[in-house]
Amino acid sequence: MILGILQARTSSSRLPGKVLRPLMGRAMILRELDRLKECREITRLVLATSSDPMDDELAQTVEAAGYDVYRGSLDDVLGRYYHCAQRYMPTHVVRLTGDCPVIDPHIVDQVTAQHIAEHNDYTSMTERFPDGLDTEVMTYAALEKAYQEAALPSEREHVTLYIRRHPERFRVGTVDCAEDYGAMRWTVDEPQDFALIEKIYERLYPQHPVFTMEDILTLFREDETLAHINQGIMRNEGLKKSIAAERVL
């Protein structure tokens, strides 16, 4: 069984409550779940949020929409993933994040299929893909090993960091993009990110609700002003801050 775990919380430091912001009349997190529901490789899909009361509304919103919810540690996200996976005992786990409302289910399937075909412990995407399509796949055994061995705060907060830091201990694979679109930013961390996502949905969703990466790229070619809306924001800023904080200590 392949379990898709979408991690999300309400307490974003840069854009609090972003996952519940209305996007074409529906909470952003539900838009992402609706897209992930189209994945053919994922057997079961669950939202993993925290047990903190501030995430009560998030959990209730997602459950009311008919999706499974697991609640665990706020800060030990690796532990939250592992205990969530324990409930379902999958063979593989697909890691997804709640700040990617234009995630492409076809790419999720591509990464998952390659992971299985190559018998990898862990498979990720290169940064040649636009930021906001993030998909990682790992075996349950690899997740368990990371849970048991990861000690640094950054490795508990960022679920797959321990695996990526120890490639000698895992069979690791990557999925590359045919062209380099790494400068494009389709994730939501800042107000200008959400402004861009709103425009993408307004332009594409009415005609094609499950629009793809290629559809967005075509839209950007037709309207070059879109790329300027959220220029200049650092990729993976949260991860870089966590690692920098440990170096200071």
Please name every model-derived segment.
Residues 1-49:
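N-terminal glycine-rich phosphate-binding loop and ensuing alpha1 helix
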Residues 30-91:
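Conserved N-terminal catalytic core of the sugar/cofactor nucleotidyltransferase
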Residues 42, 89-90, 117-121, 170:
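Short, high-confidence coil segments that cap the C-terminus of an alpha-helix
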Residues 83, 104-130:
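Conserved donor-nucleotide/metal-binding helix-loop-beta segment in metal-dependent transferases, i.e.
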Residues 87, 110-121, 139-155, 165:
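Basic phosphate/pyrophosphate-binding loop/patch that engages nucleotide-derived ligands
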Residues 90, 133-147, 191-195:
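Conserved nucleotide-sugar donor-binding
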Residues 90-100:
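Short beta-strand-to-loop acidic/aromatic patch adjacent to the donor-nucleotide binding site
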Residues 138, 160-249:
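Conserved alpha/beta core of the MobA/IspD/sugar-nucleotide pyrophosphorylase nucleotidyltransferase superfamily
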